[in-house]
Structures are given as structure tokens and as C-alpha cells.
Design a protein with these regions (language model features):
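Catalytic phosphate/nucleotide-handling subdomain of diverse soluble enzymes
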Residues: 7-13, 24-25, 118-154
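Short glycine/threonine-rich catalytic loop with a Thr-x-Gly-x-Asp
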Residues: 105-109
Length: 154
């Protein structure tokens, strides 16, 4: 419903995987991927110079896709949605922070959004702004992997 509002900023968040410069990511719009055809839809697609689809890379299976839907691509092209990217490492750190500070076990996919939103809030420094994050899913299936990450990085 907010896409018609002029005083509302809408952000999408993509997985930067190991970093956009590494080429191992799923950040189709953030990396300025070209227009191509994927699954019959014309939209931005991660692909090589020959037009072959590149494999996307991210820890979050729900974000692991080489393209973006055409409606989202259009809204990004006219500036209605701004895209940000979060690395897998930043998402893992956000998962651990959310567990520690709130007791919430967010789905790993949600952690990309939480990280980018917190970063954007810090950048704006406007206490009168309201921020809405749409989250879904549960991180129960991510707990073992995140605990291993925590142990390996202590």
C-alpha cells in the first residue's frame, strides 16, 4: 500500500553474499545486473557477457536467486524502491545480536533486512521517522549453523 505514497521510502534488501566485488552474491539490483530473460520474465538478471545465467550465491536459501521479478525491477528503475545489500557475515552477526538482545530467532533472510535497516537508521539520525520492517519466518532451522559460526569466530 505504501508504493503510492510520496513521503514514504521503500527499501529492498538483497544478499551481497561474500561481497558484491567478489562476484559471489545474489544482489541483482544492487550490483546493477543487466536486463535479461529468466523463467520467461524480462527483468534484471545475474548473467555473463554471453547472456548465460550466473549462479547466485548466499547463505540464505530464500534469497538465492539470479533474478528479480519484473514489477520490482520496474519500481526500482523509477526510483520508487531503493535497494541495499547485506553480506552473509553481516546477516549472521545480526542473527546473533537479535537472539542475544531480543530473544527472537529471526529467519536468516530477515537478518539481511534488519541489518540494512539499522544501518540506514543510523545514517539518517532522524528521531521523528518511523521505520517498519516486514519480517516473516523462523530461525529455528538456522540455530545450529549460527552456533557453529559463533564458535568458529570467537
Amino acid at each position: 500500500p505504501y508504493y503510492k505514497e510520496n513521503n514514504v521510502d521503500i527499501f529492498g534488501v538483497e544478499s551481497a553474499g561474500e561481497g558484491i566485488a567478489s562476484g559471489k552474491h545474489a544482489a541483482t539490483l544492487t550490483s546493477k545486473a543487466p536486463i535479461g530473460i529468466l523463467l520467461g520474465a524480462r527483468s534484471n538478471v545475474l548473467m555473463n557477457n554471453d547472456g548465460q545465467i550466473n549462479e547466485s550465491f548466499t547463505e540464505a536459501s530464500g534469497l538465492d536467486f539470479s533474478g528479480v521479478g519484473p514489477e520490482i525491477c520496474y519500481m526500482a528503475s523509477i526510483g520508487k524502491i531503493k535497494f541495499l545489500a547485506t553480506t552473509d557475515k553481516e546477516a549472521r552477526e545480526t542473527f546473533l545480536m537479535m537472539c542475544r538482545k531480543t530473544g527472537i530467532l529471526p529467519a536468516i533472510e530477515a537478518c539481511y533486512v534488519i541489518h540494512a535497516t539499522l544501518k540506514e537508521i543510523k545514517k539518517r539520525k532522524n528521531p521523528k521517522e518511523n521505520h517498519l520492517i516486514h519480517l516473516c519466518g523462523s530461525g529455528e532451522s538456522n540455530v545450529a549453523r549460527m552456533l557453529k559460526y559463533k564458535r568458529d569466530n570467537e
